[in-house]
Amino acid sequence: MSFTPDTAAAIARARQHGVGDLLRRTASRYPDKLAVVAGERRFTYAEFDAAVNRTANALAARGVAKGDRLALLSRNCWEFGVLAFATAKLGVVLVPVNFMLGPSEIAFILGHSGATGMVAQDAFTATAEQALAEAGLTGGVRGRIGGVAEGWEDVADWWTVGPADDPEVAVADDDPLRLMYTSGTESRPKGVMLSSRSLIAQYVSCVIDGGMSADDIEVHSLPMYHCAQLDCFFSVDVYLGATSVILPGPDPAALLATIESERATKLFCPPTVWISLLRHPDFDTRDLSSLRKGYYGASAMPVEVLKELQRRLPDVELWNFYGQTEMAPLATILRPHEQLSKAGSAGRAAINVETVLVDEAGEPVPPGEIGEIAHRSPHAALGYYADEEKTADSFRGGWFHSGDLGVMDADGYLSVVDRKKDMIKTGGENVASREVEEAIYLLDGVAEVAVFGISHPHWIEAVTAVVVPKPDAALTTDAVLAHARQHLAGYKCPKYVVFAEALPKNPSGKILKRDLRARHGDLATRDGATTS
């Protein structure tokens, strides 16, 4: 059956199911319900939707259109949430930027993404200006969160004036909405393209397998530039009509106080932050009795910490979320009743995901054997922006090949045993060992270096460098660390530096990092260990 173009367009608009549409529907269902809390600001869903619409219309009036890329450099704030949904309603691709990166690292993302505009929080305006200059970007929209500055508009003007009508832009299911830069395993980050199809399928998996509901009151303290906090939790809360309490960061005292004051029921933290909460003196004095749901990810929860959490927060159910940015990001879930019986496991595939382990030839491996973790799902990204070669390799055969190695038992429970290409996950952040190695190689006197992660009681994994000096070089730990800090974001710098006469290698000359991990894996517990 065929219809006139006008009728077909009207039907398509009626059926549109994009991320931006989710907010409009939630605001229609729960107009007076508390949507977002950030400091003294409190928005109902009707108010939040109006702020999003005004922002979208303001961006459109400034020439920002569907398909354009808008970079966002900011800590968590309610404005971040507004921009995430305003860009989604316009079909503009949001490019969240890690605020811990330096100007050169940000400049690469700006240039590679093709960003035509940028919004920066006041604390990062100077960094943003350096990055924009280095990237050669002189035009486009520049918005500042936190007031006006020379060359920057105060973004408060965007959501306080102008029409609050929905912009009514036709956004298709597979139009890109997010360009998330992941460290991957390379010296340069890759831009992962996520669409409404990817994100909403992932939201459904989070809701069903993660036990989420409209009654949740969630504290968001992990960086929203990560798709975990932004799209496993904040956007899902908006989808459901739950309440989001936004903190600028995971300060333990502030987190505990906020759980008490807002009667929060739900919290996501990587294990490092859960450990910080447990060790904080306020943990036993704050009223945390409202908390019912706890989530962790980014790395495995140490079993002793898991037991302590269950002992000290007996009414809190725990979920382990495992995945990758390319999966928007959820792939597998370990549910509350499985936490101790399957301790250390990443759980089973989420409802909208198929997960298998494959060998080097792409063939499935039997239960109990190590293989590369691969997923097939509508969660999956559209690919890597402007990188056909890496996209073809990672998505070969219709499966996303994660680069992680794992073992699956006969019941389908996955355990992650290694990262195929030496990714380090420290404090919830991804660090590519190659990038750190390349930075250290720039230091005079370095003959060889190998960077890897070792177990750490706080960071879960600590970046560790074994350095082989050149003959007669007078290298010191302080010199290596000072050099690293000049070239890398702080979280990428080594926590431990070890000097050696040689690196272990196989007959073909490949450095045996597994041997190095075994040799230096107890550095965190040694007396006198050198740490940054």
Label the predicted regions.
Residues 24, 57, 61-62, 89-159, ...:
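Structural core segment of the AMP-binding/adenylate-forming
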Residues 56, 68-69, 75-103, 111-117, ...:
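A short helix-loop-beta submotif of the ANL/AMP-binding
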Residues 264-268, 280-341, 354:
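Gly/Ser/Thr-rich phosphate-binding loop
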Residues 200-217, 225-266, 280:
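Conserved AMP-binding/adenylation subdomain of ANL enzymes
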Residues 16, 31-32, 150, 162-181, ...:
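Conserved pre-ATP/AMP-binding loop-to-beta segment of ANL
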Residues 11-19, 24, 32-77, 81-85, ...:
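Conserved AMP-binding/adenylate-forming core of the ANL superfamily
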Residues 101, 107, 118-122, 267, ...:
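AMP-binding/adenylate-forming catalytic core of the ANL superfamily
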Residues 44-46, 177-201:
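Conserved AMP-binding A3 loop
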